Amino acid sequence: MDVSIPKSQHKTVCRTEYGTLQKVILCKPEHMTIKDVINETQKHFEDDNIHVKTANDQHSRLVEALRSHNVEVVLLPVRDGLPEQVFTRDIGFVIGEKAFLSSMTEPIRQGEEAVIKDFFHSQGISYTRMLDTSIEGGDVIIDDDIVYVGISQRTDISAIGQLEEALPEYTIVPVKLHEKFLHLDCVFNIISESEALIYSQAIEPDAADMLAKRYDLIEVPEDEQFTLGTNVLSIGKKTIISLPGNRHVNQQLSKRGYHIIEIDLSEIIKSGGSFRCCTMPLIRGE
């Protein structure tokens, strides 16, 4: 499938996780707090909670890094009462040239869809609303004509049928996660046509075997899964944004010829998401 589409031709186009990132949605963590614990990472950091100034400083460095690599960054407006807004990946996703509006599971996050819906309307972006199911963008990973969908705490198996109906030209592949793991991108991420990061213990054996036949898998150790070693962000041309503390992951990627941009996102990670979670790509090229 041709991915060499000029930036100006489409308002949304994403066909891989590793094509050159051209336009992406983020949101500042201005109201970030661990209020209602909704994942295992938050349980660990509930007493420490979030230092909002530190989180904002770290987020600003991520935005600066993206812009310095010629990525157009769209910052959504922040709203009171939405402490998880920083994790823009979950509220929507783009597959091919089609945008989708997610259906959020947790009540504390359910106001976030309205913000991205307002943005879509303001930009004249048509979208498909996922109804009568639950699905979040952290469970959606694309690789050309294949879409992997995590079946998790946040995404229900009923979403598969809706995606198949909306995307008949794609193969939709469900990937069952063990219950404690939040999203597919917390344990799996494709970084090239042939390579992917994985924490295989989080994935049902049949699904892990299927992925091993398709990709050269780079195993993430347990301690670096906790700091979301798989949740890197590829910006194209074998350049990846990753956490400095995930040394094993970064060393393995460097050995394979990837350029690593290390940014500290440790304050935001306390709430259960890292670089991929904080970014919703609108346009990727080759």
UniProtKB/Swiss-Prot annotation:
Its EC number is 3.5.3.-. One of its GO terms (biological process) is arginine deiminase pathway. It comes from the Bacteria. CDD domains: amidinotransferase-like (cd21113). The active site is at residues 183, 277. Keywords: Hydrolase. It is an enzyme of class 3 (hydrolase). PANTHER family: ARGININE DEIMINASE. Belongs to the DDAH family. This is Uncharacterized protein YkgA.
